[in-house]
């Protein structure tokens, strides 16, 4: 089974990243992309990592009020000017997500629909409305304490049902 659909495998990957590599933000990128790419959402998306883009004429469309997000979600068409449906901003699991964070606010203003996650907590904003806020676990005394698998199932269901366009 896929890491993106199996909570035990997902937890193990987060824990390994946490223990072996201080779970730096970039450790989450492949996990986040897999969760989105393998969602059962009927709206097929192109998930593009723009986290290390430099400003250029080509990349300007991905540059918002808060700079580049980590990912942009585009229409799944093989065209350069595919419509942008939203973005994803990731933080390290050791960083608590702040709904008033300037970077998040800029991404919401620029891209409208934003998934905001540190791997343990997942939030989705549609404009200024927080549509879901699901906590898979938290760090307590330097160790990840996981919540019930039902939270994971709820997260997958919510992601599967996001209306991107």
Where are these regions (language model features)?
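A short, conserved, highly charged catalytic patch centered on acidic carboxylates
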Residues: 1-113, 121-165
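Charged, structured surface patches that assemble and position nucleic-acid processing machinery
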Residues: 118
């Amino acid at each position: 089974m896929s890491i993106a659909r199996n909570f035990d495998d997902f937890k193990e990957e987060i824990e390994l990243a946490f223990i072996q590599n201080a779970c730096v933000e970039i450790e989450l990128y492949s996990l986040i992309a897999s969760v989105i790419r393998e969602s059962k959402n009927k709206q097929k998306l192109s998930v593009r990592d723009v986290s290390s883009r430099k400003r250029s004429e080509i990349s300007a469309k991905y540059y918002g009020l808060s700079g580049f997000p980590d990912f942009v979600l585009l229409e799944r068409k093989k065209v350069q000017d595919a419509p942008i449906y939203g973005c994803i901003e990731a933080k390290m699991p050791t960083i608590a997500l702040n709904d008033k964070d300037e970077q998040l606010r800029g991404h919401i203003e620029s891209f409208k629909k934003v998934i905001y996650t540190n791997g343990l907590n997942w939030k989705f904003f549609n404009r200024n409305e927080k549509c879901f806020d699901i906590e898979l676990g938290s760090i307590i005394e330097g160790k990840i304490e996981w919540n019930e698998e039902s939270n994971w199932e709820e997260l997958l269901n919510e992601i599967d049902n996001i209306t991107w366009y």
